[in-house]
Swiss-Prot record:
The keyword Ribonucleoprotein does not apply. GO terms for biological process: anatomical structure formation involved in morphogenesis; anterior/posterior axis specification; anterior/posterior pattern specification; apoptotic signaling pathway; axial mesodermal cell fate specification; brain development; cell differentiation; cell fate commitment. This is Nodal. The gene is Nodal. Belongs to the TGF-beta family. Keywords: Cleavage on pair of basic residues, Cytokine, Developmental protein, Disulfide bond, Glycoprotein, Growth factor, Secreted, Signal. CDD domains: TGF_beta_NODAL. InterPro entries: Cystine-knot_cytokine (IPR029034), TGF-b_C (IPR001839), TGF-beta-rel (IPR015615), TGFb_CS (IPR017948). SMART domains: TGFB. Disulfide bonds join 254-320, 283-351, 287-353. PROSITE patterns: TGF_BETA_1, TGF_BETA_2.
Length: 354
């Protein structure tokens, strides 16, 4: 099996875990029954995966929690709990399973309401008040609705961009239960077609790009599956976070230590005027498995440390090495002239596992 085929199979497996199978036709809302099936979100994501030119750093597919299409008033509810760090939204679009242009009202603009609602806690009392947070209302004229790959597509970049730029704004929207909740007899929610999705294309902030580091580690730490792993540890399970607790003595972990350099000892003292000595620092110590964000790993180092945890005799540990350095200004003699020059990468500022 080729590496490309293996990656596709892994993506399919991840999708199956994250998105339950679509409901049967009898359970779908009336406006989706009996219609030709649209390409699944997985098929669309695979087409993006095969695209040789990535459109953004991160592409998310959010399945609708609830959809209500009544005439020209359309309401969509998604779980935006992933909004934990700032991102620059490049493009956002709703991809819906609608039969065709005849379902788009032509007498006026569509009113679109976007809500946030976290996925329900299975231990919650069904009679409890449900919380749904309004995020944005905007209008779309019929000419802005397009049809691509068997789906109805609505571009919604501008209304949602502020939420990714300031994820804390979502928390500020949480008001009193009286304002944001409604009490009603409990009825099971109507399943929503799994092909109704919100596609979000976003880039990491420029400062985060410049810092580099293991983007896979950030995703793993913020994912809902990582959060579930933490819960399993709290309940006595054996999860990823519990394994991380078995670390070497912190005093033996990768760190920066003093490293005094004397130019006279290496025979350079005759032409270097200043400094004659300086503290270059160096890195020493063990790297934990798996390695944490505080050790500034690359994606490759993070994956290597995970494999080392499960195959300790086959995979070598990552190495403690400089990840950030700074220059040293030196005054020295060159062909009878006195020069002042700044030489980069002379002093270790931070150590990490690579």
């Amino acid at each position: 099996m080729s590496a490309h085929s293996l990656r596709i199979l892994l993506l399919q497996a991840c999708w199956a875990l994250l998105h339950p199978r679509a409901p049967t036709a009898a359970a779908l809302p009336l406006w989706t029954r009996g219609q030709p099936s649209s390409p699944s979100p997985l098929a669309y994501m695979l087409s993006l995966y095969r695209d040789p030119l990535p459109r953004a750093d991160i592409i998310r597919s959010l399945q609708a929690q609830d959809v209500d299409v009544t005439g020209q008033n359309w309401t969509f509810t998604f779980d935006f709990s992933f909004l934990s760090q700032e991102e620059d939204l490049v493009w956002a679009e709703l991809r819906l399973q609608l039969p065709g242009p005849m379902d788009i009202p032509t007498e006026g603009p569509l009113t679109i309401d976007i809500f946030h609602q976290a996925k329900g806690d299975p231990e919650r009392d069904p009679a409890d008040c449900l919380e749904r947070i309004w995020m944005e209302t905007f209008t779309v004229i019929p000419s802005q609705v397009t049809f691509a790959s068997g789906s109805t597509v609505l571009e919604v970049t501008k209304p949602l961009s502020k939420w990714l730029k300031d994820p804390r704004a979502l928390e500020k929207q949480v008001s009193s239960r009286a304002e944001k909740c409604w009490h009603q007899p409990y009825t099971p929610p109507v399943p929503v077609a799994s092909t109704n999705v919100l596609m979000l294309y976003s880039n990491r902030p420029q400062e985060q790009r410049q810092l580099g580091g293991a983007t896979l580690l950030w995703e793993a730490e913020s994912s809902w599956r990582a959060q579930e792993g933490q819960l399993s540890v709290e309940r006595g399970g054996w999860g990823r976070r519990q394994r991380r607790h078995h670390l070497p003595d912190r005093s033996q972990l990768c760190r920066r230590v003093k490293f005094q350099v004397d130019f006279n000892l290496i025979g350079w003292g005759s032409w270097i005027i200043y400094p004659k000595q300086y503290n270059a620092y160096r890195c020493e110590g063990e790297c934990p498995n798996p390695v944490g964000e505080e050790f500034h790993p690359t994606n490759h180092a993070y994956i290597q440390s995970l494999l080392k945890r499960y195959q300790p005799h086959r995979v070598p540990s990552t190495c403690c090495a400089p990840v950030k350095t700074k220059p040293l200004s030196m005054l020295y003699v060159d062909n009878g002239r006195v020069l002042l020059e700044h030489h980069k990468d002379m002093i270790v500022e931070e150590c990490g596992c690579l």
